[in-house]
Structures are given as structure tokens and as C-alpha cells.
Amino acid sequence: MSLTYKPKMQHEDMQDLSSQIRFVAAEGKIWLGEQRMLVMQLSTLASFRREIISLIGVERAKGFFLRLGYQSGLMDAELARKLRPAMREEEVFLAGPQLYALKGMVKVRLLTMDIAIRDGRFNVEAEWIDSFEVDICRTELGLMNEPVCWTVLGYASGYGSAFMGRRIIFQETSCRGCGDDKCLIVGKTAEEWGDVSSFEAYFKSDPIVDERYELQTQVANLRNRLKQYDGQYYGIGHSPAYKRICETIDKAARGRVSVLLLGETGVGKEVIARSVHLRSERAEQPFVAVNCAAIPPDLIESELFGVDKGAYTGAVNARAGRFERANGGTIFLDEVIELTPRAQATLLRVLQEGELERVGGDRTRKVDVRLITATNENLEEAVKMGRFRADLFFRLNVFPVHIPPLRERVEDIPLLVEHFLRRHHKEYGKKTLGLSDRAMEACLHYQWPGNIRELENALERGVILTESNESINVESLFPGLATATEGDRLSSEGRLEEESGDSWFRQIIDQGVSLEDLEAGLMRTAMDRCGQNISQAARLLGLTRPAMAYRLKKLDPSLSVKAMGR
């Protein structure tokens, strides 16, 4: 299906776009959909542009602003598709020029537009009126020797590419910023342009930045290798709470003292246990992790301490237990409170004497193992209730370490998000744009009762539900969570007005609008928005086509359904 531009086809109503803007002054935030926005003086942007040009030169500055605009265009194309699902896909493209204007970037006057998504055809010509970048140059920086609308040009290329699903390139053929009468642009597929290698080079990361990043990456990798070799790997985090954990581990790691890790479920106790092992002199020896709650009570002794042949039915071969396999290294017993009384007694002997006997055997075996245990329950209460041996508790509780929950490590969430997204992108063979700003804010404010494990699961769900090159939204992470934010919004006249759940209804009543007039207005607006297509307008209002046609005929009895078209 193709679309050739005609003036009457331009989608004039942008209420669906402007309604996405929220000014939440109480929080100091402005939102466009799920992306956080800023209002900034043009003179500030002019100073920024001047500094960038003086710092890296005109050519590199041009590439920088083109890439900046390109990223913004990608996000706005995603927003346009979400807000206009009932319209023909080609007509959704017109949301791009409206978002240009809504952001104060430029007014767009489309001259020609011929789009065929299935055929990969894209030809657009337009005039840009009052570009903010032209104003910057004409009033602050002076005229230049080439077109200056770099950010807007990058935006158009990013928006067009995301919309078409293929590489679209816009070029500015004339520009008021270099003395021309008008700002004119032409957009075509990369193939139609021919050799555009010199222009496409602007969209590649700057070599200086790449080289610096590559060096930083190499240094970081070397540091990580040194840390792992020296046993200083702790996982992910830089919050004060996490740094305190690392300092505590440092003090205990080099000895052989028993460490008891305390904390809620999902806080990363096994990661901390591995950190203790890697930091110790036993780093080159085995690290064996056991979840005591996952082993049936009647098998826990044989699993931990081994079994001799014939000890019980089915024991046809002798088998070493986890303690013997960890000899010389470290064993980590998670959910240690789940040990049976007999297993607790055997564990106490191992700690006191450094020896054990396999189940069904009579031979004493020496073991040299460092013990790290963990629980999310209160062991002292378990001792009082008779569930856990007091003498064993005192042996385990020599060096207790409390691991804080994720809600007390909010600063670590962005790092953890980046880590888990990288992992799941690789696992599912896709690359999203990461979390939307609102989704990240939701993560920072959520209490995370399941801690890091719950965060990882939520991010995995987000990656699964989100298409490549789209942002992960709040709904994908937290199904059913309300995302609406009360605040001030833009009215149709461009003024800020307070909005809450029922403010729109109050406004209708205050203006004396009748139910009949309201229905008629909804019908007309839906039809205008959908290019007089009854089926699309019906979907927009949640009606069937016959119901929509009936209401339209009721609104205008002289109108025949056949004359109304589709």
C-alpha cells in the first residue's frame, strides 16, 4: 500500500500527541509518554553548540548532533506507532512532523510524500520553517558555509528509518542558516541516494570517542581479570551499602573463619559467598555451592558427607559427598536452617574435628574445607524453638554478614539493569533500546521484595515482550501497574491546565456540553482523524462498523452509508 501526499491528508489534530506531555512540577519532571523531557533556553543550547564546535571542530560536531537527533527520532517513531494503532501505518508517519513542532524544533510543511512500506519506497520533500538551529546560527553563531539543521536532520533520518524498517537518509538541500531563502529537505532510501558513504560516516561513533572507549574497556577488562585473579570480585554495585559489604568481606576473606550470610531471599548471597572464596587463599581450589532446601531430608546426609556402598537400598557404589569434593576449597551451604538434626550433628563434627564419616561407613576421612553458610530466616529464633542446634549456631555465627535488600541499594539498580539486559539480549538474540525513562524510574521506586532475583526476572520478561529497537516500558516490567501521572498538561491552546482522573469530565460539565453534542463531536473527530474511514474510526471509538454507521446516519440523516465509503 502506498501513500501519496495531498494537503487534505495531513493529520491536523495532534491532541493524541500533546496529551502525552505531563508537567509534574511537584517532582520537577516533564514527561512525553514514557520519556523524560527538558525545557531549556535556546541560548543555553547555543552555548552548548558553540562549546562542542570549539572543542572538536565543525565536522565532528555535525556528526555528534546528527547522532543526537537520530536517537530522538527512533524513540518518537516508537511513540507514534503506539499512539495511532487504528490509523493506516503510512499516515502514522505524519506524527513525526507534528512531534517536531510540539517539541519546538521546527514547523514542517510537507511538499511531496510517496511511501510504500511493503515495496520499500520512500520519497519525501518538505520545507522546514523556523528551525531552532537556524535561529541559533543567525542570532548567536552567525551564518555558516553549509546547512546547519543537524539535529533536526538526524531526527528525520532516525524517525524515517525506524518507521520504514530500513535505512532512510534525509539531506538538507538548502538552508537559511547558510544564507538560503528556505530550509528544504529531501528524504530517500539509502539505495536511492547512491553513494552516501561520506554522509553515513556522520552516523558512526566518533573515532576519538571509540578509541577512548576501547582503551577504557581494555583497562576495565584487565582490572576485572586482576580482581578475579586476586580474588577481589564482588559482583555489581557501587552504592555505599554495597561498598560496606565489600569492605567487610575483605576483612574476613583471607582467613578461614566461618562466614554466615544473612539477608532476604534474592539478595545475592551466593555471589557474596563466591567473592569470599575468590578473595581468599583458596581461590584456585574448588568452590561448591549447595542449596539445602532443594535436597530431600532423607538424602541430605549422603549428599553432603558421602555414602559407602551398600549403606542403603540403591547405594550400589560408594560416592564422595560435597564436603569431600570441596576439600582444600570452600563449601557454601545456602538455607542451612533446613538441615536435619543428624546432618547438623555431622556438620558440627566437621567444624570441630575437620573429619567426617560417609553414611554407612566406619572410616574417618580428613577434610580441609572453609564453610560459608546463608539463611533468610532468624537462626537465633530457630535455636529458641528447638529447630537448630545452639552449639552449631555459635560455630556458624563467628563472622555474620548482613546483605542489604535491593531497596536499600537503589544506586546499584541502573548497573544491575545494564548487566541483566546485556545477558538477556544475548540469550534471546535481540537488542532493545533499554528501559524507557519512566520504566527506569519505576524500577528505582519499586520496593523489590524479591530483590535482585525479582529484578532479573522482570527484565527478562521485558526483553521477551519488547521488539528489537524499541524501549522496554513499565507495563512490560510490571503488568497491571498504573502508569498515569497526574500533573499539568497542554491544552489545545497550548496553555498548561491541571489534569486528574476526572478533570476532563468536570470541564465538559462546566462548559455545558450536552451528551448529544459530545457524541457528535467524538464521531466527527474520529472520522477526521481516520481520513473518513468508518472502519478505522469505529475501532478508534471501540465500536463495530455497523454501530458507527448507524450513529453517523443518525447525526446526518441525509448521508447514505454508501456515500460514506469504507
UniProtKB/Swiss-Prot annotation:
DNA-binding region, residue intervals: 534-553
Sigma-54 factor interaction domain sequence ranges: 235-464
Name of the molecule in the record: Transcriptional regulatory protein XylR
Cross-referenced Gene3D superfamilies: 1.10.8.60, Homeodomain-like, P-loop containing nucleotide triphosphate hydrolases, Trafficking protein particle complex subunit 3
Binding site for ATP: 263-270, 326-335
PROSITE patterns: SIGMA54_INTERACT_1, SIGMA54_INTERACT_2, SIGMA54_INTERACT_3, SIGMA54_INTERACT_4
Job description of the protein: Regulatory protein of the TOL plasmid xyl operons. In the presence of m-xylene or m-methylbenzyl alcohol XylR activates both the xylCMABN operon and the regulatory gene xylS; xylS itself activates the xylXYZLTEGFJQKIH operon. XylR interacts with sigma-54.
Domain of life from the UniProt record: Bacteria
A Gene Ontology biological process term: regulation of DNA-templated transcription
Pfam families registered for this protein in UniProt: HTH_8, Sigma54_activat, V4R, XylR_N
Database matches in InterPro entries: AAA+_ATPase, Homeodomain-like_sf, HTH_Fis, NO_sig/Golgi_transp_ligand-bd, P-loop_NTPase, Sigma_54_int, Sigma_54_int_dom_ATP-bd_1, Sigma_54_int_dom_ATP-bd_2
GO MF, any single term: ATP hydrolysis activity
UniProt keyword annotations, A-Z: Activator, Aromatic hydrocarbons catabolism, ATP-binding, DNA-binding, Nucleotide-binding, Plasmid, Transcription, Transcription regulation, Two-component regulatory system
